[in-house]
């Protein structure tokens, strides 16, 4: 790591860089999943979700670039391979799975909420453990963006029953008496 004199030790900077690289990995997996759902969504909400997810993956792309640049600002190198992303990410892929539109939304809510929990922890650790208030502030902004996205996605499926796997439960059709 190059010698940088910004009021943080090499150990503090490396600790924050490690956190940022995990956030970068999770953001990349979420970007890929969001794009995949953008391509695969079908049904009556196609246009709404297709457009919403385009906005989301464009924002994720901006955030990924900002995270990588923050790593470089601190003298580190951002991970940049799928192997590296998969090793560091806390989010999981759903390879070969094409859920319903509601299932896609539910999966993305879970992923954004996981990222929010991770970012909340990383904000605290950046500030308290590593004394890097700049990165803590940066991560707070990212966390707030994910909170808003999760809220929008949750609002889309609010009131709809959803199984833990993101599917809607089968419902019985009841024929009215006398029909």
From Swiss-Prot:
GO terms for molecular function: ferric iron binding; oxidoreductase activity, acting on metal ions. Belongs to the Dps family. Residues 165-179 have a biased composition (Polar residues). Residues 160-179 are annotated as: Disordered. InterPro entries: DPS_DNA-bd, DPS_DNA-bd_CS, Ferritin-like, Ferritin-like_SF, Ferritin_DPS_dom. It comes from the Bacteria. It comes from Nostoc sp. (strain PCC 7120 / SAG 25.82 / UTEX 2576). PANTHER family: DNA PROTECTION DURING STARVATION PROTEIN, GENERAL STRESS PROTEIN 20U. This is Uncharacterized low temperature-induced protein all0458. CDD domains: DPS. Pfam families: Ferritin.
């Amino acid at each position: 790591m190059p010698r940088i004199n910004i009021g943080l030790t090499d150990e503090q900077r490396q600790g924050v860089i490690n956190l940022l690289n995990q956030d970068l990995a999770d953001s990349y997996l979420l970007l890929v999943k969001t794009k995949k759902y953008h391509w695969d969504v079908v049904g009556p909400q196609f246009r709404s979700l297709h457009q919403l997810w385009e906005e989301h993956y464009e924002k994720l792309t901006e955030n990924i670039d900002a995270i990588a640049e923050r790593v470089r600002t601190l003298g580190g190198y951002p991970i940049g391979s799928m192997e590296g992303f998969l090793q560091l990410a806390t989010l999981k892929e759903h390879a070969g799975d094409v859920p319903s539109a509601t299932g896609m939304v539910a999966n993305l809510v879970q992923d954004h909420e996981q990222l929010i929990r991770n970012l909340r922890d990383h904000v605290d650790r950046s500030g308290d453990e590593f004394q890097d208030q700049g990165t803590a502030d940066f991560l707070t902004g990212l966390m707030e963006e994910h909170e808003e996205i999760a809220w929008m996605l949750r609002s889309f499926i609010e009131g709809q029953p959803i199984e833990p796997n993101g599917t809607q439960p089968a419902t019985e059709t009841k024929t009215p008496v006398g029909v």
